[in-house]
């Protein structure tokens, strides 16, 4: 009588033959990342956001609905909310630079401001408190074809001799002819000219991403409440800030300019390709049918989904979430399967495969009432912008 092992051999042959014919596949069986029902994920995300908002506002429970005054918001509160919302939108529109770009040599380009004799300056209201510097964005795009290639941008100004100390502020030309504060500088008296440099990398990336033709900066004297005279005393080569508010003619090639440091397009071709391959952000995920890890849309209506009326603005927002498998190349027929088996043995509750998690998050500005007093708050990390496998 043959041994028991030999008696079982005919039964095992079909199974062995099936394994031979089956191509190597990712070790999905070793992953503990479970597939979750989409509706269940959405419900859990909504409940998590409910607790997240209350926790960030340090509220044990939602305010009483009867405490919310009827009618529109005060103009000052609405203006503060709108400016906060615009600032967040502007910052989120900035493309994220790629770390790989630091490897390549940078090409340095100088883009001069538009001459003040150009008629585009006629649209700007002259003031003894400020000077204005406008730039043609077509020249910027010629130097830097894509925002992601920009490594650094500096606004360079040649300050002439200064008799008195002055505090100056730099502003960016923004939407609706408004100006957004960027930075400030305390200038000491000096008998010799001095180059001033402002880091405006984020601003120039915004300009390269938008379709505008003319963008610019404003340099203003700091306006203190106890000062009667806030006239700009600083003279910039190529400009004049006289008390009449006139702008002088250009003085040679040392007028204000943008110094751009960028990776040349021909050196960053593979960077461009890899960026699109890895960019699991809303621009890619919302316009594709990607089944692997990606950002999934989720709009939360505060009244409908949370039953809240105490948040006055916005009425809702796109919270989004990350979902999808993260495939990897470890197959069952490789040495890594032994490592994974050992890992699972010692960490039974952990995941051997990467999971889809948020990478970039954005804040959410809100207006809500405490009693009858409206408050504007910015809640951090409320909107999923991109995902990654980790």
Swiss-Prot record:
GO molecular function list: cytokine activity; growth factor activity; type I transforming growth factor beta receptor binding; type II transforming growth factor beta receptor binding; type III transforming growth factor beta receptor binding
Cleaved signal peptide residues: 1-29
Annotated site location: Cleavage: 278-279
Taxonomy of the source species: Eukaryota, Metazoa, Chordata, Craniata, Vertebrata
Modification(s) after translation: Transforming growth factor beta-1 proprotein: The precursor proprotein is cleaved in the Golgi apparatus by FURIN to form Transforming growth factor beta-1 (TGF-beta-1) and Latency-associated peptide (LAP) chains, which remain non-covalently linked, rendering TGF-beta-1 inactive.
Matches recorded under CDD domains: TGF_beta_TGFB1
The protein's name in its UniProt record: Transforming growth factor beta-1 proprotein
SUPFAM superfamilies associated with the record: Cystine-knot cytokines
Keywords for this protein: Cleavage on pair of basic residues, Disulfide bond, Extracellular matrix, Glycoprotein, Growth factor, Mitogen, Secreted, Signal
GO cellular component: blood microparticle; cell surface; cytoplasm; extracellular space; nucleus
Bowtie tail: annotated segments: 226-252
Gene3D superfamilies referenced in this protein's UniProt entry, alphabetically: 2.60.120.970, Cystine-knot cytokines
Protein family: Belongs to the TGF-beta family.
Disulfide bonds: 285-294, 293-356, 322-387, 326-389
Species annotation: Mustela putorius furo
């Amino acid at each position: 009588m043959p041994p028991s092992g030999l008696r079982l051999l005919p039964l095992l042959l079909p199974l062995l033959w099936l394994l031979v014919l089956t191509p190597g596949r990712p070790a999905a069986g070793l992953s503990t990342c479970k597939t979750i029902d989409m509706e269940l994920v959405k419900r859990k995300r909504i409940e998590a956001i409910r607790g997240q908002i209350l926790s960030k506002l340090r509220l044990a429970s939602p305010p009483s609905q009867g405490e919310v005054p009827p009618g529109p918001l005060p103009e000052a509160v609405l203006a503060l909310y709108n400016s906060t919302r615009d600032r967040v939108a502007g910052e989120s529109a900035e493309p994220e630079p790629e770390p790989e770009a630091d490897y390549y040599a940078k090409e340095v380009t100088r883009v001069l401001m538009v001459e003040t004799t150009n008629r585009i300056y006629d649209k700007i209201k002259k003031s003894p408190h400020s000077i204005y510097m406008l730039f043609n964005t077509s020249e910027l795009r010629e130097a830097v074809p894509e925002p992601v290639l920009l490594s650094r941008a500096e606004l360079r100004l040649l300050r002439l001799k200064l008799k008195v100390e002055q505090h100056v502020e730099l502003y960016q030309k923004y939407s609706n002819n408004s100006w957004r504060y960027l930075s400030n500088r305390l200038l000491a008296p000096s008998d010799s000219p001095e180059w001033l440099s402002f880091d405006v990398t984020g601003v120039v990336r915004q300009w390269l991403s938008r379709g505008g033709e003319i963008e610019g900066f404003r340099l203003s004297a700091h306006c203190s409440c106890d000062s009667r005279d806030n006239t700009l005393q600083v003279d910039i080569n190529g400009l004049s800030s006289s008390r009449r508010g006139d702008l002088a003619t250009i003085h040679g090639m040392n007028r204000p300019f943008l110094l751009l440091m960028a990776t040349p397009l021909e050196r960053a071709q593979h960077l461009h390709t890899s960026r699109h391959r890895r960019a699991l952000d809303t621009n890619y995920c919302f316009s594709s049918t990607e089944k692997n890890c990606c950002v999934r849309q989720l709009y939360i209506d505060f009244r409908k989904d949370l039953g809240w009326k105490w948040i006055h603005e916005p009425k809702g927002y796109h919270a989004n979430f990350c979902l999808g498998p993260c495939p990897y190349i470890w197959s069952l027929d490789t040495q890594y399967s032994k490592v994974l088996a050992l890992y699972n043995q010692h960490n039974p509750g952990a995941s051997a495969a990467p999971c889809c998690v948020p990478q970039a998050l954005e804040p959410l500005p809100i207006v809500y009432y405490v009693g009858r007093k409206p408050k504007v708050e910015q809640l951090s990390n409320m909107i999923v912008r991109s995902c990654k496998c980790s």
